[in-house]
């Protein structure tokens, strides 16, 4: 059973913002307003490009989130989502910690297994993404607790660490939460095994409930503690269109 929690609201700087061609200053202004008016979180997409919309402006999420952190005080800040292919897990771990420190403990790592877009045209192999995703999250969490006096090792199929460490401890304890983007049987199972939250997009209530139950079964299977289960966050990204005319809003939604 999902532990009842207060309902929170955030904003997503996703394809909608990129397609609109908003400038950096406009995005920062909107984020400052969201922070002042009581929104709980701000997320930022991670794409290299969206060539189907030629006039879109596509920016780096980690740089933008750091800029947003500097002009906000309360909102949590996360990627929605970065992927497990384009960056080495050490880079993702350090970027997340850096954002957490700049924001004084407000960082969230939203991460998925990736997609062919943004990979193939840059000749980045799109192979075994879910297996790499699992190892990435394990490596990232291992590195969160590393120091020069406590180096870490990892011997995976795709990633290896030998006496590795980072030198910037996160503010959040034990580390920034990991929200996993999942919708398939295996990815839902891994979310229950490794995640601190779940970040699906565009679900119906029925599908959300079904997939949430699969995550809960995985939590039980992998002996997650009751505290981990209670603290697990169930999120959902949905599109919202504002208009004085309901039919116009529905047309935009479609």
Positions of predicted regions on the chain:
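Active-site-adjacent structural elements that line small-molecule/cofactor binding pockets in enzymes
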Residues: 1-254
